[in-house]
Amino acid sequence: MTNIRKSHPLLKIVNDSFIDLPTPSSISAWWNFGSLLGICLALQILTGLFLAMHYTSDTATAFSSVTHICRDVNYGWVLRYLHANGASMFFICLYLHVGRGLYYGSYLYKETWNVGVILLFAVMATAFMGYVLPWGQMSFWGATVITNLLSAIPYIGTSLVEWIWGGFSVDKATLTRFFAFHFLLPFITSAMVMVHLLFLHETGSNNPTGIPSNADMIPFHPYYTIKDILGLFMMITALLALVLFAPDMLGDPDNYMPANPLSTPPHIKPEWYFLFAYAILRSIPNKLGGVLALVVSILILIIIPLLHTSKQRSMTFRPISQCLFWLLVADLLTLTWIGGQPVEYPYVIIGQLASVLYFSIIIVFMPLVGLMENYLLKW
């Protein structure tokens, strides 16, 4: 008799995805982040669901309802800080996952990569709308500044912004719709994760060498289930340390003040995981130019497969490309730092140089170095 997990219509899908899935024997811990992201998404949906039971999306009571969750709901503070810091863990895992894809040439699985980029946009949109919900000062002004950027779109800009706001400023209508979309998007994201995995399992996983590994595969369970559980424990430990010892470390103190449309905070800035894009936005003096640079800084990931000139897939055996990759990482860290600084000398010029370098590395230097390495290897 066939094993039920191999014959049952539903269990068969689970079996082929997580149990008997043929996996390259050489994949390193950098391949753990997919499962960690899945767990992050599940955690966010779960904590978010319980928070939504106590939250009210009305400008008069939103701030008070968050206070009520933290003070009066049983373990409400744990839920709230797990959700807020869970978002930070989500983005740490996301950026490491994308970085892994760039380093090892995983972007050559174009369908998987493109769905992944759409997923990144979906998670960013969800996080932005979630930041608005507590209705603190930074929530209100962050929403005002970022949505107002759309007014730079020629001809339809102003109408578009007012349509998104549901009025002439960020107000009750804006908060209500942001809550609705913040609740909805994670479920859409979950469906897209299925598509992401569907495309991935069509080709199988890449591996650190970038060489096809069809001849050397092992079952996902028990080898990689155990390996992923180690990564999970490490992430949960880091998250709990953050939640229980420094829950506000990554937040903004201004958000503990209720939203006040008549008082602007001295430095309006988004959450830390958007600071690199915010720095690119601010480094261009023109409004439309800044908005375009902001969008392109993420959208550029879509064209990375087209910019691959090397005859090797992975960077494992390409030292010059490795140097460029780590320069890109350092540049992104610099942009993140600049995004949190005030708009004054020397931060402005550093931000502008880092922004130019960011686009130059991806569009110019990496393809050229790929060609150069081909030439050096006489290929």
Swiss-Prot record:
Membrane topology of the entry: Multi-pass membrane protein
InterPro entries tied to this protein: Cyt_b/b6_C (IPR005798), Cyt_b/b6_C_sf (IPR036150), Cyt_b/b6_N (IPR005797), Cytb/b6-like_sf (IPR027387), Cytochrome_b (IPR030689), Cytochrome_b_C_euk/bac (IPR048260), Cytochrome_b_N_euk/bac (IPR048259), Di-haem_cyt_TM (IPR016174)
PANTHER family: CYTOCHROME B
Keywords assigned: Electron transport, Heme, Iron, Membrane, Metal-binding, Mitochondrion, Mitochondrion inner membrane, Respiratory chain, Transmembrane, Transmembrane helix, Transport, Ubiquinone
Binding note for cofactor: Binds 2 heme b groups non-covalently.
Record gene name: MT-CYB
Annotated organism of origin: Cnephaeus serotinus (Serotine bat)
Family designation: Belongs to the cytochrome b family.
Purpose of the protein: Component of the ubiquinol-cytochrome c reductase complex (complex III or cytochrome b-c1 complex) that is part of the mitochondrial respiratory chain. The b-c1 complex mediates electron transfer from ubiquinol to cytochrome c. Contributes to the generation of a proton gradient across the mitochondrial membrane that is then used for ATP synthesis.
Binding site for heme b b562: H83, H182
Positions of transmembrane segments: 33-53, 77-98, 113-133, 178-198, 226-246, 288-308, 320-340, 347-367
Cofactor(s), by name: heme b
Note: Heme 1 (or BL or b562) is low-potential and absorbs at about 562 nm, and heme 2 (or BH or b566) is high-potential and absorbs at about 566 nm.
A GO MF term: metal ion binding
Binding locations of heme b b566: H97, H196
Pfam families the UniProt entry points to: Cytochrom_B_C, Cytochrome_B
Protein's name in the database: Cytochrome b
Main subcellular localisation: mitochondrion
